[in-house]
Amino acid sequence: MTPSQRVSAVFAEQFEQQPDLLVRAPGRVNLIGEHTDYNDGFVLPCAIDYETCVAIGLRDDSLVHVIAADYGNQRDLFDLDQPIGHHADQRWSDYIRGVVKYLQERGYPLRGLNLVVSGNVPQGAGLSSSASLEVAIGQAFKEALGLAITQAEIALNGQQAENQFVGCNCGIMDQMISASGKQDHALLLDCRSLETRLIPMPTDLAVLIVNSNVRRGLVDSEYNTRRQQCEAAARHYGVKALRDLDLAALEAGKAGLDEVCYRRARHVVGDNSRTLAAADALAQGDLVRLGELMADSHAAMRDDFEITVPAIDGLVEIIKARIGTEGGVRMTGGGFGGCVVALLHPDKVAEVIAAVDAEYPARFGLKADSYVCRASAGAGKL
């Protein structure tokens, strides 16, 4: 059952009426540009065809009644006329409450809704299931109540909910691509200006995401450490963010900078440059150049930023050996596990998945999950 079918069925069963409308918001995979977003840099994600769906029913009061179809129909009920606080014990509720709270604070006129939520974005895999949920809820209120809110504002509102209400640091990339993606395109995003450029994906290119199923135990604490190291490096160079440096300036001014902070900065500055080059290579269908840039990005994440783990590096090796030079593969997401993303010719997908299924468990004692994706449209009404 798809998420849209599921929310429709659960809505009819639980509220004893049909929903007034449905909305969706996709997950995403970042093709290149890792840990660059909070450094005011560049990223190149695409939305994927895994998504969060919301079935919506209008109410004539100020209550928001939410049912989480994926959590045994757990419920949350809160009143728009009362201060919106945290839920006592349902973490999923806080993503929704945060989105609604900040929509209110931005001055949008809200009223009560019945909502049923379901999604198939793999959780904990670095494919932005949380951003997909935040954007889907923002989209639900926009479509149901006719709010004059832009897709960029829905994204910023979702990011604020995650940073300030849920308490997880994140850049703007995940919400922005979920809100504003376009089918068969990647999105080059300038995380400082929020300017975007749609990059057409070659029609003969498959997007393969492979989840290592490595438990990402360190990711939150290490993410915050990397962020602090990047900020320390920016202070050393006297710039607002690492976005403002190129490799020559980085090298010229490194005297007195802690060696670890220098290597962290070298990855970020390099990945900004690689991301801009990758957008051009993708637009030109130059899979050889794209593969080189993805390989360089992965090596920098492994050696300079130190966010990969042996199983991830092994997955990249297994896949790269099958892809050859026509396409690329790298870890994607925050690090310490999660997924790798590969861009390759469609006729190689089956061979790559077979190699992963045979070699990865033998080397690392883990089974990987593979998802063949298509670059998909951003959030909207179904």
Swiss-Prot record:
Gene for this protein? galK
Cellular component GO terms held in the UniProt record = cytosol
Q: What is its EC number?
A: 2.7.1.6
Q: Does the keyword Metal-binding apply?
A: yes
Q: Which residues form a coiled coil?
A: none
Q: Where is it mostly found?
A: cytoplasm
Instruction: Name the pathway.
Output: Carbohydrate metabolism; galactose metabolism
Taxonomy, superkingdom: Bacteria
Q: Identify the PANTHER family for this entry.
A: GALACTOKINASE-RELATED, MEVALONATE KINASE/GALACTOKINASE
Kindly provide the name given to this protein in its UniProt entry.
Galactokinase
User: Which residues of this protein are annotated with the site description Transition state stabilizer?
Assistant: 28
Q: What organism does this protein naturally occur in?
A: Aeromonas hydrophila subsp. hydrophila (strain ATCC 7966 / DSM 30187 / BCRC 13018 / CCUG 14551 / JCM 1027 / KCTC 2358 / NCIMB 9240 / NCTC 8049)
GO BP terms: galactose metabolic process
What family does the database annotate?
A: Belongs to the GHMP kinase family. GalK subfamily.
The keyword ATP-binding appears for this protein: yes
Q: Subcellular location, in the record's words? A: Cytoplasm
Q: Which PROSITE patterns match?
A: GALACTOKINASE, GHMP_KINASES_ATP
Which reaction equations make up its catalytic activity? alpha-D-galactose + ATP = alpha-D-galactose 1-phosphate + ADP + H(+)
Which GO molecular function terms does the record list?
Answer: ATP binding; galactokinase activity; magnesium ion binding
Q: What does this protein do?
A: Catalyzes the transfer of the gamma-phosphate of ATP to D-galactose to form alpha-D-galactose-1-phosphate (Gal-1-P).
Q: Which UniProt keywords apply?
A: ATP-binding, Carbohydrate metabolism, Cytoplasm, Galactose metabolism, Kinase, Magnesium, Metal-binding, Nucleotide-binding, Transferase
User: What positions does the entry give for ATP binding?
Assistant: 124-130
- Where in the sequence is the active site? 174
Residues that bind substrate, according to the entry? Answer: 34-37, 223
